[in-house]
Structure formats: C-alpha cells, structure tokens
Amino acid sequence: MSFFWLFPFLLHLSFADSLSPLSAPVQNFIHLNHSCPSSILTYSRNSTYFTNLKTLLSSLSSRNASYSTGFQTATAGQAPDRVTGLFLCRGDVSQEVCRNCVAFSVKETLYWCPYNKEVVLYYDECMLRYSHRNILSTVTYDGSAILLNGANISSSNQNQVDEFRDLVSSTLNLAAVEAANSSKKFYTRKVITPQPLYLLVQCTPDLTRQDCLRCLQKSIKGMSLYRIGGRFFYPSCNSRYENYSFYNETATRSSSPPSLPPRSTPQQQLKLAPPPLISERGKGRNSSVIIVVVVPIIALLLLFVAFFSLRAKKTRTNYEREPLTEESDDITTAGSLQFDFKAIEAATNKFCETNKLGQGGFGEVYKGIFPSGVQVAVKRLSKTSGQGEREFANEVIVVAKLQHRNLVRLLGFCLERDERILVYEFVPNKSLDYFIFDSTMQSLLDWTRRYKIIGGIARGILYLHQDSRLTIIHRDLKAGNILLGDDMNAKIADFGMARIFGMDQTEANTRRIVGTYGYMSPEYAMYGQFSMKSDVYSFGVLVLEIISGKKNSNVYQMDGTSAGNLVTYTWRLWSNGSPLELVDPSFRDNYRINEVSRCIHIALLCVQEEAEDRPTMSAIVQMLTTSSIALAVPQRPGFFFRSSKHEQVGLVDRLSINTSALCSVDDASITNVTPR
C-alpha cells in the first residue's frame, strides 16, 4: 500500500468519509484541468448549500448512479441553495472505470475548488460538474480547456500540412454530425491515411441535436489543427484527435464503420497460400511436441510470477508497518508514483533545450508531454547540485501528500541510476518574478490580479501550516517559487527545503541554514530558529515585492540618502505617512487605495523583528478577506537599516559578522552548513 495519503485540506474531514460509498479502493486518474471562477459566489462550510452539495456528490458517486450510460444528473435542495450536478464518462470506458473516475473526481473536487459554487473538473475518463445554477439541458461555453500535443506536423511541405489540417477538420465535423444524431451523443472515427488518425467527439446526452452539433463545431474551431494531436473541452462537449489509438476500439467498433480490405489481384491471390494440411497421424505427433515444449515453459513462468508476487507482497507489508515520520522518508516507498526514465526522456524529447522552462534551485526544469496529451513540468536534478538524497526524498514525501489549488501538484518521480527527477503538473504562466520584476511584463499583472495572487499565496501557506495533515514549514518562500496557473492562480512550488513538524511542535533549531537572501527571518538567519513565523516573515517580504514590483535585496534611495532594502524603505514611507509611494507605477490609478494600504500594513506586521509579534497565517487570511478587522500597529521590522551606515540596528551588525556564508548574493536558493 502506498503511503501517499490523499487527505482533504478542508477542516471538515467527515466530508471525504460521507462521499466514499465504494468499498473497493479507487484508482488514480490524471487531473487534466478544472474551472472554478473566482467571480462566482462561494459558500461556507456551515451553509445549507454545502449540506446540499454533499448530498448531490454522494448521489452522483453512489452505486445506483447510471454508470452503464456514462451520464447522470442530480439536484439537491431548494432555491436559493439548490445544487445541480452531473457527470459524463467517456463513451468507450467500462462501467467500472466510469464509477471509479466519478468517485475519484468527487473526492478531489474540494482540493481544486474549495468553497466555489460553480465547478468543472476534467479527467481523461470523465468530467464532473456542479453549480448553483440550472446546468441541465443547457449548452455552456464557460470553463473551457485545451490540451495540445507538443509536436507539430512533421512536414516541411505547407501543402501537406494544409491537407492534414483539412482532413482533421472535415473528419471531426463529420463525426460531430454523427454524434449529434446519436442517442448517446458520442462518436469515434478511425481514418487510414499514410498514418492512422483517431478522432473522438462527445456531448452530454441531455442536449438537443442542434445544441450538441453547435457545441462540437465550436470546440473543433477552438483547436490548433497544426499539431499531430489535440483536444478541446467545454462543460457541454469535447472533441479530440490523435495519431495513436487513445480509446477502446473494441467498445466503439459499432460507431466506426469498418474499413473494407483492399481488393487483391490474381497475382496477389496466388501468394496467399493456404496453411499446410496436417494428417491425423502428424497432428498427434505435433500435439505431443507442443505439450512437451510448452508445458515446462508455462510452469517456469508461473514460478517466476509466484516468486515476484510473494516478494512484492512482503515489500508492501513492510511499507504498511512503517508509519510516515520525518525520519522515515525512504523514497522507495513511493513506488506507486514512480515514472520510467525512458518515458520521461521521450516526453521531454530527450531533455531538448527548446523544452527547457528554466533553472531551478537544484537543477533544470523541462516541459514534457506524454502520449496521452498530458503536459508536465520535469525537474531534473543536477548531479552537482546541492540537493542530496535527503532533499530529494523530502520533496517527494512532502509534496506528494499535499493537495491544494494553491500548491503545485507532484505527479511522480524517477530514481534510476544517477538520475533524480520530479514530475509536476504543468503550470503555464511561469513564475511570479518573471512578471513583477520585469518592466515590460509588469503591466500584465494589474492590481486586481496581484491582489488575487496575494490571497492565493496566503491560503496556500495556511494550508501548509494548519489545514494539512502535518505542519509544513516551507523555508524558501520567494517570488521565484510562486508559479502562476492558467487564470494567474498562485501555486507555491519547490519543497526541497521544507520541514515537517510534529503535532505539538511549534519551532525547531537547525545548523543547516537554507533559504534565499532577503526572505529569511532574523531569528532563522542568525540563530537557525525556524517556525511558522519564519514563513510569515517571507510572506510579508513577498507582499511588498508584489505591490511595488521591486526586489527586497536591492538598495533604495530616499531624500537623497540610502534607505536600505525594500522592507526598510517601506517602513520609512509608512512612518512618513506616504505608503502609497511604494505602489508599482504600472498600476497608474487603477487600484483600490484601501486594499493596497491594508496589504502594506499587513506586510509590515509580517516582517516585524520579533517572531511573536507577527500574526499567524490564519489571522492574515482573515485580515485579507475581512476589511472590518482592525489591524495592530506594526513595530520596527527585522533587518532594519537606519539612514547612517554607522547606525545599523544590532541584528544587522551581527549578521554582517556571522552570516557572510549564509546569504546568497542573488536570488538563488542556498544550502550551507554553519555552526551555531
């Protein structure tokens, strides 16, 4: 049994239990995409809507649902707290796969879209959807998703490319007509070209013929047909094409017209000689030979199977007996998430330079695309990096157990020979520092988006500190470790330096100082003391950088003299009554003064010198979401620089003496062993 538990980040753990009607273990399904727009109303855990939602999801994942048809709708409650939902399984999957996929998606819905009233989750085998509005028999184009094969059509001849595009378009549109006319609203097609082409289209069966056809045609137009494969999802329909068989051809054979065999010429018929006839005497002799040869081979194979089955069972039992602790971080227990190196190598085109996404703290990160079309981020650890076996194991163990929309999701790992690789979900919009520290990119993140990012980071850290099964201290929160999803949703990444706390543990000491210059709290950088308040300090620095578009590590001028780093500069502006001078000029006047001022105030509370003065992440989330909460007066920040270089506060004086080897001169993460 794998020790990678899936546990909900919501406090109401009974929710997961109430949605587990199946006795058999549910297999994992790859999450392709989700839609939970922030503009839609949310609900609270004590609301009637949440009670109705639990009833609805239990109904959709019950044994009585219509898995045989692959489609089920349900409604729970009365207006204004009514919840309407449905699931749609791919038309070729079995009832068992459909049932397991729906059960899996029901369990995951609150991981991806906590407290959202309108949700769509996309998996390869099924789609789950619910809303506070009536979504039945209605076409919806909101919440779309597109996945494209990374390879372009391999032809330098533009005419051939256009011919392929026309073939895909025309065949998909013909399939759309067939699907719209069918009762199941599902159709597949296989076309024999120089290379086979496989296509699949599907609508929710509750749509009319016209609505289904219109939806499929719109989805086909939404795809880039210059790739060798792609798919487009709407909540009401989806279409896909590939150059390999991605569906069960046996299950869909009735919907695909069989290809007639080519007519053979008389000369070709002569070459198709019938098999030799065997006399009764020869038949008996041949049968004896077959028995003598085949039976020992089968017996030998059965012995091998029995041996390895017993060995695997023994290994699995050992894993079950060893509970997960910070010390018991044997990476071999993650077998269920292990990827084959050749598969990763193929997905990244042998780690091609064109697929390189960037340079991480311990190695390079590449984009990979598996044959199923799933895009991933592959972190290939450098053989000369500072991350050893412990850091690698730590990142796998920590991240694989974390499920939250504001955390990057670990899909698996590879540990072969001297290769150590982590496979994450692909986050398309790079990292936060790529936008806020670049003068040409800053304008793409207006204040509304940045305010949402601040809230997302806060919720992600709160989950690490309080709402996950274990208390996780990240220890390297910085702009480069905040990735941005499709909707600029913030996702915390890079857990190679994270630490797990025990149930009653609140702080710890270490001789191994890790982190990034400018983000480390004073007590951690000086004495190796770290706690949840260490991450709070880093969060405060992050907020100031997001608001200003400036790096904390730079030195800033004020009234013609040095004002120190960004934290000190902000404190001086705050003390002078002019905090809004910190605001990124790219906002112009398009921001809410009260929101920006409140965020600056909260950030200064986070970077106070004394750890006990800093708020907890739960208090910070409340401060960000409830404007009526009064804020305390911030005290002087840690690492405060006075106007004269001879008047630096004591901590800074000592830092210059004791931590020359601790702080990196750039933004790279550092790992150094220093005495306390």
Curated annotation (Swiss-Prot):
Q: Might you report a single GO cellular component term?
A: membrane
* UniProt keywords, alphabetically: ATP-binding, Glycoprotein, Kinase, Membrane, Nucleotide-binding, Phosphoprotein, Receptor, Repeat, Serine/threonine-protein kinase, Signal, Transferase, Transmembrane, Transmembrane helix
**Pfam families, sorted:** PK_Tyr_Ser-Thr, Stress-antifung
Extracellular face of the membrane:
17-287
Per the UniProt topology annotation, the Cytoplasmic ranges are 309-676
Instruction: List all membrane-crossing ranges.
Output: 288-308
Q: Give the Enzyme Commission number.
A: 2.7.11.-
Superkingdom classification of source: Eukaryota
Induction / repression? By salicylic acid (SA) or by a bacterial pathogen infection.
What reactions does this protein catalyze? L-seryl-[protein] + ATP = O-phospho-L-seryl-[protein] + ADP + H(+); L-threonyl-[protein] + ATP = O-phospho-L-threonyl-[protein] + ADP + H(+)
Compartments (UniProt record)? Membrane
The record's GO molecular-function terms, alphabetically, read:
ATP binding; protein serine kinase activity; protein serine/threonine kinase activity
What PANTHER family does the record point to?
CYSTEINE-RICH RECEPTOR-LIKE PROTEIN KINASE 13-RELATED (PTHR27002:SF997), RECEPTOR-LIKE SERINE/THREONINE-PROTEIN KINASE SD1-8 (PTHR27002)
Stated family: Belongs to the protein kinase superfamily. Ser/Thr protein kinase family. CRK subfamily.
In Swiss-Prot or TrEMBL terms, this protein is called: Cysteine-rich receptor-like protein kinase 4
Which organism was this protein described from? Answer: Arabidopsis thaliana (Mouse-ear cress)
Q: Which gene name belongs to this protein?
A: CRK4
